[in-house]
Structures are given as C-alpha cells and as structure tokens.
C-alpha cells in the first residue's frame, strides 16, 4: 500500500484498481460502498479528506451495458452468470437491483456456485439466486 500512500501524497484523489489488487484495495479503505462490501473487492478508490472510500463498479457497468447499449431490460428476466468468482460477486447486487427475477450461477465446481448463491441470496431481495455446475 506504499504506492497508494505515495499517490495520495502527490495529490491523487482517485484511481481504478485491477486484478490482482481488488481485495487489497477494499482492505485499504476506511469506508466502502454496499456493492464493494458485498463483492468483497473494490475496483475504485477515492480520497475523501483523510479517508479513503472503496467502490465496485463491475456490476453497474455490466447492467448498463446490457440495458443501455444492448437495449435489453433486466426487469423480470432470468440471468445466467458463468463462473463463481469475483466478477460474479460484483455483478449480483446490481443485477438484482435492475429487477432480474432469477439469477443462475453456473460453475465447473457446482459446490462453489451453490455456496455463493446461498451466501448472496439474503442480500438480493426480490431475486431468486441459485447455483450449480456445468
């Protein structure tokens, strides 16, 4: 995190974070958005005075791309997410907020998908979440 301290000391106010540093970015923050907390990772940090705020825009970007760029509203739809890693964790809450009726997480390791679905379901009111293998 020396790089973050040097960035801030040089006047930096915000930055984007990529793999493999998303988990460390969240840990370095003083506060985090709900999406970052739920995903367990952050892809953006912003200085707020002496504090650092972590955010996760992965899912917000995905939903915007689907709904705005492709013109496909997610409200009431079934969504299939392949993989049960960080990208899926970051996408689940924004997809649920967009009104998806059901999200199926498919992963090579069925147990990992099922565990993620079970962990996240209580946080995604109004959206059924299930996981399995492929």
Language model: regions and residue ranges:
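Phosphate/diphosphate ligand-binding glycine-rich loop within oxidoreductases
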Residues: 1-71
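Phosphate- and divalent-cation-binding pockets in alpha/beta enzyme and binding domains
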Residues: 24-25, 90, 115
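Short acidic low-complexity segments
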Residues: 124-134
């Amino acid at each position: 995190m020396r790089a973050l301290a040097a960035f801030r000391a040089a006047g930096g106010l915000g930055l984007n974070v990529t793999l493999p540093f998303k988990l460390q970015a969240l840990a370095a923050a003083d506060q985090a958005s709900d999406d970052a907390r739920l995903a367990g990772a952050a892809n953006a940090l912003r200085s707020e005075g002496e504090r650092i705020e972590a955010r996760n825009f992965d899912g917000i970007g995905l939903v915007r791309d689907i709904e705005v760029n492709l013109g496909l509203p997610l409200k009431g739809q079934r969504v299939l997410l392949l993989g049960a890693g960080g990208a899926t964790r970051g996408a689940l809450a924004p997809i649920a907020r967009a009104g998806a009726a059901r999200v199926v997480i498919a992963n090579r390791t069925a147990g990992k998908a099922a565990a993620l679905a079970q962990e996240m379901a209580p946080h995604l009111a109004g959206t059924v979440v299930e996981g399995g293998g492929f």
